Amino acid sequence: MPEVTARGIRFHVQTMDPPPADPARGAASDPPVVVFVHGLVVDDLSSFYYTLAGPVSAAGARAVLYDLRGHGRSERTPAGYSAADAVADLFGVLDALGHRRPVYLVANSFGGVVALNAALARPERVAGLVMIESYGPAERAGEWTENMLNTLGKSALVLEYERLADQLLAIGWRQRGRQARTADALVNGTSLLDDLAAIEPVRPADLAAVTCPVLAVYGEHSDIVDAGRLLLRSVPECTLHIMSGHAHTVLREGTEQLLAVMLRWLAHHAGTRVPVMAMAGGAL
């Protein structure tokens, strides 16, 4: 299991290198780095590993995936789940891997909070953002956290008092049981919920200070699609792609269309190749 230690914490990391450079094509010997930042609690780097990371690597980028603090196989600490901690963890992992030049961040759901705050805190280290159904931007405090915290609070009660992990393991659902046990330890055994409640949204005035290009991809029926529209209005260089017929599960259920849009955007901004499937995906 590949690991790095950053800020005194063990992080599970996976890296996918691009194919060898082809001198005849003039391919870059130092490929762009694309870092994937996943969502909360039951999510981990595997959600990208089996969807986006492989094709991004095949297109000529170095894909870096890591489990957020307390998630997946990364170390679970009692505290340290604020946005500032997550940003510091991100750059700590990149430093440990030796990636100090600007990188592209691909973020899903809560990962958008990390990516957006990273771009504002260290603009010299972020070359671009891909925000997939991402939380973070909002007009008012509490606008984006209320529903998420209510959902996590209810999940915490089910995990603790109904012993969901034990029930799943008892009927032979080992993977889901292990995920539930990890989620239980995270939401009921750390400061995660309190830290999330204290996170402030990134408001329009701050979004205007985002200097890198942004691709925002949201589902037509998503309950946070307004975050994508806010990004479009407020970020100086933003492309918004609304996926018709989809809700918050764009990454899992709309992978092919998402890849086509994202790979074409990366080709334009990062200089990666455009696979045939992406060229057939239509204009942004």
Specify the residue positions occupied by each region the protein language model found.
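Gly/Ala-rich beta-loop-alpha elbow adjacent to hydrolase catalytic centers
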Residues: 107, 111, 115
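Conserved HGGG/HGGXW glycine-rich cap/lid loop of the alpha/beta-hydrolase fold
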Residues: 12, 16-73
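Conserved loop-alpha-helix segment in the C-terminal half of the alpha/beta-hydrolase fold
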Residues: 214-246
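Catalytic active-site module of serine/aspartate enzymes centered on a nucleophile-bearing elbow/loop
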Residues: 238-284
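Flexible "cap/lid" loop of the alpha/beta hydrolase fold
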Residues: 116-120, 129-157
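Residue in the alpha/beta-hydrolase core beta-strand immediately N-terminal to the catalytic nucleophile
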Residues: 103-104, 127-130
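Active-site loop/oxyanion-hole signature of alpha/beta-hydrolase fold enzymes
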Residues: 54, 65-104, 260
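Conserved alpha/beta-hydrolase catalytic His-Asp/Glu region
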Residues: 140-146, 155-209
